[in-house]
Amino acid sequence: MKADNDLYRQLRELPAAQLWNVEVPKFDQLGPKERNQQVALVRAVGVVFTTSRNPEMKAAVKAWMISLLQDPSEKIRRYATAAIPKLGGDEESERKLIDILKTTDVDREKKKVASALEKIGGAATLKAVAGSGEKLIDEQKVRASVARQGGPSNVRLDAIVPKQPGLRLHLRCRKGLESIVADEVREDEGRGGKFRVVEVRGCFVVVEPKDAFTLAELYQLRCFDTAAFSLAFIREPGSAEALEVLAKAIASPLTEKLMLALTQGAARYRLSMVSEGNHDDAVAKVTKKAFELNPRVLNDARESPWSVDVHFDELRALVELRPRISPNPRLYYRTDAVNAASHPPLAACLVRVAGRQDKEIVWDPFCGSGLELIESALAGGVGQIVGTDIDPAAIAIAEANFKAAKLTGTKAAFHTADFRDIIRIPELDRGKVSLVISNPPLGRRVRVPNMHGLFTDLFKIASEVLRPNGRLVFINPLRLSSVDPTLRLESSRTVDLGGYDCRLEVYRKR
């Protein structure tokens, strides 16, 4: 085995052309014993050509692998079997693998063939499984493979979810932002929105639909991170019965009804245990049991449009059905991002906390890709946005994002500049800016020298440019407050930004 691995590593380093034009012909001319000794070549070729962008070359490699399925050596057949799914299965490879499954007496070859058929199998594999009662092949995986072959599946934003008693959704967010998310829902309800706040909990807000709705209507709300349908609460998630309860929740009529109604293409889900540790064994048991209970609800970890998320706390687990929506319809304007860019819902939360004034002039001193500025303009009432950043690449991205947002009623100016050089920025007249808003460098993903000095200067400059009653709204990673008497701290809340706490603060200019 060690010799095979050493040879494989050597062959992996060779150019693809040399592997195919030199090493493969040499391998084909060898006798049975020598071919077995050089079997690592089959593995190397399979891996190297998996990413080939030459369709003719890839097809030729796959044809060679299929021919090896008839080799007298079980080891060579097994290596070729492992390579075929990486190259893309077809009816010919499926047929030959089924033939091997029916004829071989070697257990490890049976297992390898079964694994390959689970990845590329189609109707012929399903028929073979049904006819033979073959237990090595996971029927659910084959059905998922067949579904993928039928084309991509997507969550439909325009599909109507009928009103039904007891239906709840969880709007998840970063810890500390729950009240902002809830306030947005309540305000939207006051304008005729379709959702009502039921409960505010740690990291999520429970809402119920007041009427039939679409996900497009839900995604008009901008402050939540992800949305999911509540499926079940599991008490004592560590108990032996917990996996059974979880499987029943996945296989339930509610899950099936939601997935079928809201999916274009085959409805499939992946199961995610949102906690530390390895949960592979539990996931396998639950998805198998759920399929036994309801074979119309398919598990597919590879390309599923839905995720069943299990969130744990000390006493229970929450089971949610989350649509995997990509791209996010709220970020239609996001053409690109920068390193350490703002978390988009956090930008929307900053804007909401800031409130609105007439004819706003909004400045982000560290604008990055421009999310806070664009979210401010989307909220309305903004006449001018100004973005500064020392990185010219960030400024280019911010300009492109603003253009994509199509905010024709708002003027925009972006400058590659240090925020302290306000004299170079004509749009920043002293005492004219109504809102300074930013998620500034926090010193985590991007190192920032003299953080204390940076934020001291931010307070000073904000005081200079803000008009009376103007606001400074930002994320503060330091235990540092303004000493400027013209800036009054109006609110401060602790927010978890991925393992470390910061403060979302609002200062108002006297």
Spans of features found by a protein language model:
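Glycine/charge-rich, flexible interdomain linkers and switch-proximal surface loops
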Residues: A301-R316
